[in-house]
């Protein structure tokens, strides 16, 4: 069962485990574990997506319990009225508190976007980021005798595909576990020495105005075991008090094989 973070007559939010698809895709026809179908079976009613999380990303996923609720939520996301907060573990020491305004060329899928235009101009992409902590571990990576990691808080102000992953790669601080935009040697080292066998990106919090009641709504998602073990090993416990926890549900024991 998935962990339900919030539910009322109009909305439901769950803590999406890493490795789970949000909805079925013809690109992954054999995938049996899908968030939308699992939530539908769990609560006994249909759900309607308003946003998405990449397969390897964990955290808050908010859905409507009717097509109208889904539409209103989607409109808020599209108009950037919903504040999103993520946390990531990255390569190196990133301690800036800054905003990156770096346009991104649309990332196309070789199959799904086979017939899409190839001459589209880069799209505006803005990310606010803040370094929270750093650590240097006595583990060699490549030609270096030690390995450095950073804990970063991220708030995307736009919603481009893989925006956070691509922006951090642009800053030369790729997210650990990112097999597409990251550092493969760092990924292997983190997996071998610190059991970070997934993309270390977590959607920690959504802050919005409820689309039906007009009341402020904050939804937060706890970290899974992989994250908590990393925080412990790096001496970062207590830095994310709203998301840290000790006990875990079965659903939080995510499939660590999906890192793409």
From Swiss-Prot:
Pfam families in the cross-refs = PseudoU_synth_2
- Which UniProt keyword terms apply here? Isomerase, tRNA processing
Reaction catalyzed: uridine(65) in tRNA = pseudouridine(65) in tRNA
GO biological process entries: enzyme-directed rRNA pseudouridine synthesis; tRNA processing
* One function term, GO molecular function aspect: pseudouridine synthase activity
Please give the PROSITE patterns that the UniProt record associates with this protein. Answer: PSI_RLU
Statement: the UniProt record of this protein carries the keyword Iron-sulfur: no
Please name the InterPro entries in this protein's record: PsdUridine_synth_cat_dom_sf (IPR020103), PsdUridine_synth_RluA-like_CS (IPR006224), PsdUridine_synth_RsuA/RluA (IPR006145), RluA_PseudoU_synthase (IPR050188)
The enzyme class is: isomerase
Q: Which residues form the active site?
A: 54
- Documented EC number(s): 5.4.99.26
Record family assignment: Belongs to the pseudouridine synthase RluA family.
Query: Which PANTHER family does this entry report, sorted A to Z?
Result: MITOCHONDRIAL RNA PSEUDOURIDINE SYNTHASE, TRNA PSEUDOURIDINE SYNTHASE C
Q: What does this protein do?
A: Responsible for synthesis of pseudouridine from uracil-65 in transfer RNAs.
What is the name of this protein?
tRNA pseudouridine synthase C
Q: What is the species listed in this Swiss-Prot or TrEMBL entry?
A: Salmonella typhimurium (strain LT2 / SGSC1412 / ATCC 700720)
């Amino acid at each position: 069962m998935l962990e339900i973070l919030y539910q009322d007559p109009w909305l439901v939010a769950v803590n999406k485990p890493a490795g789970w698809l949000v909805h079925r895709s013809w690109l992954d026809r054999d995938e049996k574990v899908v968030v939308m179908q699992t939530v539908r079976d769990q609560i006994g009613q249909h759900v309607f997506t308003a946003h998405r999380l990449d397969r390897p990303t964990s955290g808050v996923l908010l859905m409507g319990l009717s097509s109208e609720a889904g539409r209103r939520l989607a409109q808020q996301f599209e108009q950037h009225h919903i504040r999103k907060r993520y946390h990531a573990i990255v390569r190196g020491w990133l301690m800036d508190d800054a905003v990156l305004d770096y346009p991104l060329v649309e990332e196309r899928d070789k199959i799904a976007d086979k017939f899409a235009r190839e001459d589209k101009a880069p799209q505006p992409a803005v990310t606010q980021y803040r370094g929270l902590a750093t650590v240097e571990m006595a583990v060699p990576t490549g030609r270096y005798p030690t390995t450095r990691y950073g804990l970063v808080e991220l708030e995307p102000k736009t919603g481009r595909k893989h925006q956070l992953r691509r922006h951090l790669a642009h800053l030369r601080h790729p997210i650990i576990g990112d097999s597409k935009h990251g550092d493969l040697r760092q990924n292997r080292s983190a997996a071998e020495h610190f059991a970070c066998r997934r993309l270390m990106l977590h959607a920690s919090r959504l802050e919005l105005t409820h689309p039906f009641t007009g009341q402020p709504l904050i939804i937060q998602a706890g970290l899974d075991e992989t994250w908590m073990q990393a925080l412990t090993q790096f001496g970062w416990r207590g830095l994310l008090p709203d998301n840290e926890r000790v006990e875990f549900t079965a659903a939080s024991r995510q499939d660590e094989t999906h890192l793409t």
